[in-house]
């Protein structure tokens, strides 16, 4: 019998070879045809019906015969009764199957009995009748599955027979074993295919089911993983146990804690268990049953091993890519709805690609999984000594060949889908006369305006301008790029597109439909022209904008199935901005990219050349080089809105006011916007790949070199705000207005009447020659006045203020513990809050003290006309006491005036009051004035104050005071203070109007308007 069956096996080989050749050409369709040929040429199954057989309740003899005939099973009606026939064929009446001279005998009574005993037999053997089609009933389904099973069993018997013969020393060639192995693999594939109907039906069914299942809440991943048998064996010996999953795949399942990845793995489990059903269980049952049918013994332990390995072969990872495709399609379809209303359906096209290729992937992946499961089961049977070891190797090799054919077919199908999408794009472009991918960027920009309208509409109010010119850049879009790559149209997709939009009164102005107006903004030529605008205007680059120039793209083949779309940028050397002529304007260049690196690593820089109007302008500069012709008006240049590096401002060579050279040092810690070239990799199946180069930007260091230097030329710029780093300023011989902004800055005003601000940080400010204003701001600053009349304000922090020359000087310590050094001219001192030390000079000095100040120490060097103003204290609030050579001024604490070492000098200590200086000079303050204008002369304080004895208003001081009509000291003191302040060159008039550096309505928030005005008001009011 074995030899006759072997002859039949040999006949199958030609059929299978023909199948593999056709499959290589036509993919899944050829596979289906090949499987049909195998089935038609399979082992002959004959249904034997004894003459005394009567069908049981629930079925009929007629149904059984019809089902057999529909499946091509021969029906033999015997003249013998059931018992005689059974004993003749099977030797017993209890067997279902046996052998006859004509083929394999199926005993109808026993089969009928089996059907009625197990109503779910058809499902366990071959799937539901619905899966096979409505025309096949349960009986037909069971017969079909049994027929396929018998083919597998007999193929296994033939292979087993060959192996036994070889072990017994017979000459059995390797080709005979290979042919038998091929037959076994083909039978296994046929079994699984029959369980789901045709290959086409299966693909369609899976495509329908995949999307709904992926929408399920996938939970309980850990418990599902725990149910995979023998998963604990994963590790170094994992491959040796199963031979199916790699260590990488196993470690992915076991160790990846990322939730997203877990969801994907769970999705794979859902597909494998819910859509595929119990394929692993079915395959292992087929293999075990096949061995039993072949007369070989098995054990529960070996059966468990087979089931375990088969379960691992159908891993959730096998379906990970399938799950990704359907999920990606779903996400893209949802995403596309946003842009369809703006006339772009590219995202929906991309979704259709993932849907169609996902269905193909699902069908072919499932067939591959079945092949892997079959190979795994046979391998496990070999491990359990149920079959010889060569069987596993043969089956594995054959299934590998079939898998390769499927992969080749898949690639061709994927490319056909891509071509279909490309044709749709061509049709759209022909109809609309526009680049499809540019239309995608237009839709993205429309959505951007919709999303950011509230923000953009606020700029009119925020910047106090009538018109906003907003420039944005739609950068490279990965979906647009992917669609271009898949459709082989990478050369047609630009790196993005730039747009200009106008806002007035918070409303978007209508203009050209494509929102691109070359009259105002031309990114190809690098020109921006606002000269036609007759309103106060803000020019703002909302997003980073690429360097000016034209993109050239070329698609080339770089390998057998590899393509590259190369990018070349024909860049411009500079942007030219023509400003608003007759209205105030603001120009914000901080998002205009000036530094670029091409794909070869070569660096280039794009200069911004600005020709501004005749009014007051503000210009925010970036990290690259700029040339600014600011024109008339009070114009301010800002460097603190973005990282512009370490700056040096130099006006020492200026021939006109407002001329400066700004050098920028971009060290390793300086991150700037720079243009770079990146690559998007796109795969169309496994073998075909597209690489698309595109421009993008990033915020990172940019090392200058190769002749590239960042330098600004400023012309007619009246005020400069530095960076947030350590800057150096060198003024001109004209008026300079500098702001250090953040960082520890060094500022040198040099000649001219300068206004210098340190702002935040520990700054050093030198006024140089001229009447200068120096303001330290926050931090521990050092202010040096130099020649001329100087106005120094330390601001917050522990500051040091010095003036060495000049007829008039104002020194304000501000908050903190300060040290003030006056000149030998006329000095006005106000130490401010904190414990300060003040050094007077030989000239006429005025010291101001307020009750909220701390302990001030005054070292008066001489002079005979010094004044101390107690700005908000009366003589009733203070007392005087001599300690050594010092005169101490005490102020009341909680309404009580104390004379005690803990309280003495809680207001002021005037050092060496009672110590005579050289050549008759004294260290006294000749006049002390209170808030009401009453004053006392130093000679009376000297007479009344004995060592250790306090003197105040109530014990002798009152009679020495000068006050009341005719004796009020405040009017004259007010005049003296105003003269000192106005002599510094900053203030004049009754209310202290600023003449230098006013800045107009666009003045910097820390401009000279604020501090001198406020100081003049409170100082003169108190006087």
Curated annotation (Swiss-Prot):
InterPro entries: Hemolysin-typ_Ca-bd_CS, Hemolysn_Ca-bd, RTX_C, RTX_pore_form, RTX_toxin/Mannuronan_C5-epim, RTX_toxin_determinant-A, Serralysin-like_metalloprot_C
Keywords for this protein: Calcium, Cytolysis, Hemolysis, Host cell membrane, Host membrane, Lipoprotein, Membrane, Palmitate, Repeat, Secreted, Toxin, Transmembrane, Transmembrane helix, Virulence
Keyword flag Calcium: yes
Main location: secreted
UniProt GO MF annotations: calcium ion binding; channel activity; toxin activity
Cellular component GO terms, alphabetical: extracellular region; host cell plasma membrane; membrane
A biological process term (GO) from this entry: killing of cells of another organism
Post-translational modification: Palmitoylated by ApxIC. The toxin only becomes active when modified.
Membrane-topology annotation of the record: Multi-pass membrane protein
Subcellular locations according to the entry: Secreted; Host cell membrane
Hemolysin-type calcium-binding repeats mapped onto the chain: 730-747, 748-765, 766-783, 784-801, 812-829, 830-847
Residue ranges of the TM segments: 226-256, 297-326, 367-406
KW Membrane (keyword) present: yes
Sequence similarity: Belongs to the RTX prokaryotic toxin (TC 1.C.11) family.
Function: One of the virulence factors of A.pleuropneumoniae, which has a strong hemolytic activity and is cytotoxic for alveolar macrophages and neutrophils.
Written domain comment of the UniProt record: The Gly-rich region is probably involved in binding calcium, which is required for target cell-binding or cytolytic activity. The three transmembrane domains are believed to be involved in pore formation by the cytotoxin.
Note in the entry: ApxIA is partially deleted in serotypes 2, 4, 6, 7, 8, 12, and totally deleted in serotype 3.
Official protein name in the record: RTX-I toxin determinant A from serotypes 5/10
Origin organism lineage: Bacteria, Pseudomonadati, Pseudomonadota, Gammaproteobacteria, Pasteurellales
